[in-house]
Amino acid sequence: MDEYFLPEVMMSAKCMQAALGTLKPLIVAEKGEDIGTVVIGTVQGDLHDIGKKIVGMMFEAAGFTVVDLGVSVPPEDFIAAIRKHKPKIVGFSALLTTTMNMQWETLKVIKA
C-alpha cells in the first residue's frame, strides 16, 4: 500500500491551485453564447474546492455564467444566490464525510 504524507498532499493541492489559475483563461477562452447561470459552492464546514473549481471552469467553457460562492457556504447563502441569480443549475460540493449531514441540510433548504 502506498503512503502519502500530509506535507506532500498539501504541496500537491497548492500545485493544483496554481495550475488551475494558469489553465482557466485557456479553457474559457472559447466560451460561446451565454446559455444561463450556474451557482456552485462547497457546503458549510468543508474547505475543499479543487473539484468545484474544475467543474466551474467546464461550465464556463460550455457557455454558462458561473457564480462561485466559495467554500464553507451556509445553506442560507445558497438560497440568497438562487433568488438573486435565478440559475438553471445549482451545484454544491463536499469532500469530507463529516459534512454529509450539511449536504442533506443544504438540499432540504434548497428544495423547500
Regions found by a protein language model. Give the residues of each.
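Domain-level signal for soluble alpha/beta catalytic cores
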Residues: 1-112
